[in-house]
Design a protein with these regions (language model features):
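Short, mixed-charge aromatic SLiMs
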Residues: 23-32, 69-73, 175-186
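Short terminal or interdomain "cap/linker" segment that borders an active site or interface and mediates
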Residues: 1-4, 113-152, 164-205
Length: 205
């Protein structure tokens, strides 16, 4: 859990977190372990507060996505022990091999299940006119708007590393009390992306 690793490096970590979560600062964190979502929201919110956009040169959520993509697809994270490194890189290196739009988005939908035991990511339609895909997260409530945006940023950054250019936009958000989260992904026009978009059931403009 990189969020905990980052918080452990801060001398003020115990000030940032409620005492009930200090255990994460004292105990080893297993990359393959499952942790309560309610704890994760508190942890990541605390970490975001420590990141100054002027210092890091971008929005903190965009920074998380860029860091994760470079670490996970590249498999480079010296903070992980060898077994953890192998487990982390295995998931994402498979993702890195998905260089065609259909395999890329299929991998993106499967990736959600790697880290969450509830909710499912679905590709619900496309718009040929704008070369856009629409994805939804069903059955899972994300309470933080930045974390909703982060899911779109992840795909933008993973796409950059494997040659698929896209721009994400949040259109529905459970953080805004919508019943589900939804993203539009506008793909750069290439023969491959246009063919893929046309192959998906079309939505109204």
């Amino acid at each position: 859990m990189p969020v905990v690793q980052a918080l452990k490096q801060r001398p003020d970590a115990r000030v940032l977190l409620p005492e009930s979560l200090w255990k994460y600062l004292d105990e080893p964190v297993l990359i393959s372990g499952w942790y309560p979502e309610r704890d994760y929201w508190v942890l990541i919110s605390a970490l975001v507060k420590t990141l100054d956009p002027a210092t890091i040169g971008r929005d903190p959520w965009r920074y998380f996505a860029q860091f994760s993509a470079q670490r996970d697809i590249g498999g480079q994270n010296p903070a992980l022990v060898p077994d953890e490194q192998s487990a982390a890189s295995g998931v994402y290196r498979n993702f890195a091999n998905m260089t065609e739009p259909d395999s890329f988005f299929s991998a993106a939908m499967r990736l959600w299940k790697q880290y969450h035991d509830t909710g499912r990511m679905e590709l619900v339609g496309a718009r040929r006119e704008t070369n856009t895909l629409v994805m939804r997260l069903i059955g899972f409530v994300i309470p933080i708007e930045g974390f909703v945006e982060l899911q779109g940023y992840y795909l933008e950054e993973y796409g950059k590393l494997i040659g698929i250019e896209l721009v994400s936009r949040v259109t529905r958000s459970t953080a805004r009390k919508d019943p589900f989260c939804e993203w539009e992904y506008c793909l750069a026009r290439t023969p491959a992306t246009e063919a893929y978009v046309v192959s998906i059931p079309q939505m109204l403009p």
